[in-house]
Amino acid sequence: MTLVQDRPTVTTNIATIKQWVTAMAKGDLDHAPYAEDAELSDPNGKYKGKAQILQSFKVWKTAFPKATAEVTNQIAQGDHVATEVVYKAIHTGPLVASSGTIPPTNKPIELKVMLVSAFRDGLIVRERAYFDRAGLMQQLGITIPPKP
């Protein structure tokens, strides 16, 4: 394929991610663009299948129900899209974490996230999300003791 032929797919994939990031921040998970066999990995773990991925987003939406998201940059090539996002929210619900449930702190957060998404037939099949988990805990006022 030539670059010109790839452009509509690249443009569509970029738009899909941008729309999804906005919808997810609002809690609209109904049209999540993940394939049934998709995989997501982030600092909290690995999720296999659309159902597990959506459950991980529900945990975040419970803790941060009124989040906003701004896509600040996107770069795409072929079936891959890299997206920088800034999420802003207030922690008003319980946050289920690997160490236990963190009760609401009512503190604002700003979380910078890098998404690297791979598409197949217009759906996300693999995604890696990178963010500063320790920085998030610090914003919530949670101190994580160093490992011995």
Annotate the PLM regions.
Residues M1-P148:
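C-terminal and inter-domain tail/linker signature
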